[in-house]
Amino acid sequence: MEKTQKMNKMGTEKISRLLLTMGVPMIISMVVQAVYNIVDSYFVSCMKDPNIPALGDYAVNALTLAFPVQMLMVAVGVGTGVGINSILSRSLGEGNKEKCSKISGNSIFLALCTCVVFVLFGIFGVDAYIASQTSDPIITSMAVSYLKICTYSSLGVSMYMIFEKLLQATGYTMQTTVAQIVGAVVNMILDPIMIFGWCGCPKLGIDGAAIATVIGQFISFFIDAYFYFRCNSKHFNTSLKYMKPEGRIIRQIYQVGIPAIIMQALMSILTYSINVIFVRVSTDAVTAYGIYYKIQQFVFFAAFGMNNAMIPIIAFNYGKQDKKRVNDSIKYGLIYTVSILCAGIIILQLFAKQILGIFSLTESTTELAMLAIRIITPGFIFVGANIAYQGIFQALGNGVHSLILSLVRLIVVPLPLAYIFSCFDFASSIIWIAFPIGEAVAFIVALVFMANIRRKKINPIKNSV
């Protein structure tokens, strides 16, 4: 009975409550993920050396340059996970346990392949990548060292994200939250110890930040793996014999997964391109953008958490052909996600100065980061809707629509505008406007896509089962 109730809650529980019970743990999980990205920045901003003025700013700059590759690692894991989540949830709704086992086993195989790719990039590509963004020897040295440690140890991040999605698809969101929190706490504890050489540990500087991050990721991986074999085995066979690659399953995963990977990777492309564009303005602008971006992630990742809860619920009920529950999931998913972003607008507008005061930055960098927050955050209301629509499209198998939406909001509109604005003498004051304009245009595109998908996929569904 317990097993049946667990399997059916996505098809029976009231949607408004179900989204919260599944979404809140995922929101916590995603916010904890944002902690990984900001804790390192905080501690390295406190690094000091009498021979290197503003060493903290140099270190934050180095992390900003390395960050797009870290985002790409996450993009591949999350994008693959979205494909897994979508087809696994639909297969659960259809009651196809054998297919669920194959999806899960092939997912683990794909995570191992991802790790190999990033290790090879760490060996052969990191130096050239960093050199394409800066010629400063101090920043280059720190960025290369940090990024090589992260790529060589990419097994942790690749595996924990796949196991996380496998658990989320079956409704075990609290377990993934536990794994995220424990990993983040370990990271936060180890960061100052390794960076500054506390408790008898050698003073490792920025390398210590990388090592602490990697250890935290491996801890999350081990916990998620434990819960996966313990919990998901109640619903389908979790034997590793299903790791044998099966082309049909992998194709189905990546029909949704590849657009999602590209969609997530666009954030890496955006950040890398913005770094290159902002160098034309000033080094302070690059550092300010890096700090703003990581602060912004606390709000965006909370919305992604709700999005992650919405995707399996919509997919499950679409698999069951339950029209009412699909529509309710879309409605409440939009309401909750936009509400999260509206709360983010209020918090960042009211407390920008206090939040930026956490970091040991120069006055000029702090002023630029403050300006970025003031200008960009009003556009968050469009961000909330766009994130929700991306999840809706993915859940219904329209990954290409999500990809196009991401292209518009992250590349097609903001990058050309940012480049144009960077050509003006007062570039540092106006370049930030490119981001909310991109979100507003993408919102219009999303409305058009949603109307088309509703007509073709949702409206033809017969009355609720």
Give the label of every model feature segment:
Residues 193, 387, 412-422:
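Transmembrane alpha-helical segments of integral membrane proteins
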Residues 81, 150-168, 176-184, 209-224, ...:
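Short runs within selected transmembrane alpha-helices of multi-pass transporters and secretion channels
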Residues 26, 30, 42, 86, ...:
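Transmembrane alpha-helix boundary and packing residues in multipass membrane permease domains
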Residues 136, 172-173, 282, 362, ...:
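Short loop-to-helix capping motifs
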Residues 60-120, 157-176, 288-346, 350-352, ...:
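Small-residue-rich hydrophobic transmembrane alpha-helices
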Residues 1-23, 88-155, 201-258, 314-379, ...:
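Short alpha-helical transmembrane segments in multi-pass integral membrane proteins
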Residues 35-38, 46-47, 57, 91-94, ...:
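Helix-loop interface residues and adjacent transmembrane-helix termini in multi-pass membrane transporters
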Residues 27-82, 86, 150-157, 217, ...:
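Transmembrane helix-bundle signature of multi-pass secondary active exporters and lipid flippases
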